[in-house]
Each structure stands twice: as C-alpha cells, then as structure tokens.
Amino acid sequence: MKFTTRIILYIYIGYTAVSIALFKMAGMPLFDSVFYAFTALSTGGFAMQNASIAFYHNAWIELVAIIVMIIGATNFALHYTVLKGNWKEYFKDIETKVAWTLLLIGIFLVTIFLYNSSYYGHNFLLSIRYSVFQVVSALTTTGLQTVPGNEITLQWEGMGIFVLTILMIVGAGACYNSNIL
C-alpha cells in the first residue's frame, strides 16, 4: 500500500510539473500556470478570474486545460499501468471506454447544436472549440469554462444545456480525482 501511494504521488507530481510547463508555454503567466495545473489536474475547477479559462482568449491554453482535465479524470490505477508500457489495459478498461464514448457523443451533439443555432455565426471550428472544452469540463466535473455560465443558459438553450447537464450528472468514475461514482 505504501509503495502504491508513493508511486501515485510521484505520478501526480510529474503530471503537475508537465502541466505547469505546458500552461506556461501556451502563454499563461507562471503563477496562473501553477494554479490551473493544480485545479485542472485535480478536476477542482477553481478559477482565478470570473471568466475562468476564457479570461486568456487563448486556444492553446484551452487545449492544455482539456488535456490536463482528461488526465485528471482518468483512473489513476491506469496511469501506472500505462506508464509501465501496458497501453492495452487502458483501452480494455470499461470506465475508459464509457467515458470516451460519452465524450465523443457529447462533443458531436453540442457541436452540431451550436453550429445550427447560428450563435457563433455558423462557424464550425468555433463551435467545435467551445463544445470540446465545455463537454470535457462537464464530463470530468471540473467546471472550468470558456463560455460564461450566463451565456450558456441564455444562448445555448435546449440540447446544449441538456447534454452538459447529463454529462455533469454522470461525472467522473470511482478511481478518478472527482470520485463521483
């Protein structure tokens, strides 16, 4: 038990260091990089600004946050297995399969809804950008945002809110940082 705890701690420290470096390389100030590395990896979702990640208006920062949220919401027992070189176990894990299936379905549905709603001027890439971030944040129960909450409730309406709500309810798995199930 002591050995396993130590390994998970080292993995977490390593992910944190890499996350800080990636946020910094994406253009985030160092202090903010440290803060968001911790909050995205732990899927805590705390933000330093009211606008959350949207404050930076930076697609690279959003991409880093997406990757870090997914890593943080992945079963940490699998991290060790993957780092030992056993990638097959990652793809065999039922929680991982379900999470990726929900993620892809959610992204597809929200992207189509946003594109068809003309809220983003029928801009497909912008619709994908916002849907991927919000869907990942909802499914991992992180709560970081690239779209203000009032904009989601007032403009996204219907299907977008429904999909995000379902994903938040389903949330992360038992061995994730979120410990929802």
Give the role of each language-model region:
Residues M1-L181:
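Membrane-proximal intracellular helices of multi-pass ion channels
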